[in-house]
């Protein structure tokens, strides 16, 4: 079970509100292969600190804080 501290959860929700664009650096998922460099849009951050993201051309998949890597795209 993954989880983050309340402080980390608040920071993630502030930094990645719905609509934030992100670029995938690394996704640790043996079942879904989304290439590094793929761009997506954050839908929401859940209570475990996972960023639920709609990936351009790859459907939806959550990223796990502390496991997966991404960067925010400045607009």
Could you describe each region identified by the protein language model?
Residues 2-75:
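Basic/aromatic-rich interaction segments and small domains that mediate binding to polyanionic partners
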């Amino acid at each position: 079970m993954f989880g983050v501290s309340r402080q980390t959860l608040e920071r993630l929700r502030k930094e990645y509100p719905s609509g934030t664009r992100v670029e995938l650096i690394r996704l640790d998922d043996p079942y879904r292969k989304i290439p590094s460099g793929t761009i997506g849009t954050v839908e929401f951050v859940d209570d475990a600190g996972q960023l639920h993201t709609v990936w351009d051309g790859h459907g939806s998949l959550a990223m796990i804080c502390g496991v997966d890597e991404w960067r925010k795209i400045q607009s």
